[in-house]
Structures are given as C-alpha cells and as structure tokens.
C-alpha cells in the first residue's frame, strides 16, 4: 500500500512538473522579456524591468522604472500561459490590466516612423481599436476607411487621441500587448503599453510609462527575439518564477 501511495505521489508530482514545463514552452523562444510586477492584485502601479536571454540565463538590461497599470489593479488575462483563476479574472471594462505572459505585437504612434525594428503602425485619424464585444473586429486595430464606419460604431478607442481627445498624447508612442488574441467575448480588449498622462494617473487596463522609457523599449525590442511582456503581482511572480522560467528579480522590487 505504501509503495502504491508513493507511486501515486511521484506520478502526480511528475505530471505537475510536466504541465509547468509545457506552459513555459509557449515562450521558450523568447530572447527578450519585459517584466512588470505590482505589489498586489489591487495596486495601480508597478515596476518595469527588461531582460535579455543569454547562454547563462536571463540578464537584466537597464534600470528598473516605475509604471502605472489599471485603476482597479490587475487580473488574470488571456495570453501565452494557460488560463488561471487563482485571482481576479480580466473582463471587459473592469479597469484592470491583464496579468500573465503575452506576446508583444506591433508598435504604433502618431509619427510616420519610429526608432524601432518592431513592425510599426503610423496611426491615422480613422484608426480605431474596437472594444465592442461581439463585433467581428473586437480587440483589433482597424482603419474605418477599410472596414467601414459602421464596423467601428460604438468603439471608445480612437487611436489618434490627439485628434479625437483634446490633444491627448498617451498613444503618441506605444505597442500592443497581445491579450485575448482569440477575441473571447467580454475577455478584455485594446491592451497596450503607452505613455502616461502623469506618474500619478493609472489606466483603464493598459500599462503606462514615461516617454524616455517607452523610447528605450521601442529601440531595444527586436522581432527576431520574440519578445514577451510579463505582468504579475509580486506574490504570484514569486510562486511561478521557477515553473515559468522567469528571471529572478533583484531586491527592492517595489
């Protein structure tokens, strides 16, 4: 009986380890990682670090920097990791930034070109990110001239905020965080890294930062390195760091 129970325990442990490795495999080709940690699920601010993968493992690049996240904190999103429910779960309009591991999508901005090798979208006055759940264009940046005005009807995310929102500069530079690429209804949409209005202003679900930090990220990110974006509360990061093969964070992580 004891041998039988021991065998069950070994098999259970092995299965759990394999599952963790399988999850980490989804970003095993990542050579660059942008890591944001927050003090907890309800915090609206965090710390951003950048890492490059070397033969010796993850190496921190540059200095940690402050960022702001959702006004209501963070919640598990839909990215490269398996869906989780050991914490809040991201929903459309909940004012939370999605937590997990995500591919980094195209860069975007108001200028015709940017200092980046990432795919870049020069935004126009007719570009919208559709946040209307149930729309075929849900969670997509589209040009109303191409998809038609009706396709963006009801969307609250014009990408040229300087034109549509009284000179707002927050989308002057940014990049897409690939949350909910499968367009799950009410799963959350239009998640970006973008400029902050001020260090004290949290977001409606994105991650915001100083212009100098954004410029450093855009110049550093390389599409051939398959960069990923990680956002986790510190307790969740500590719990998942080894299994998800994430960088070990330095001290003073606040």
Per-region residue spans from a language model:
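Cell wall/extracellular polymer interaction/catalysis modules
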Residues: 20-204, 212-254
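A conserved hydrophobic position in a structured secondary element of the catalytic/binding core
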Residues: 209
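Bacterial N-terminal signal peptides
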Residues: 4-14
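Short, intrinsically disordered, charge-balanced linker/junction segments flanking boundaries
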Residues: 15-19
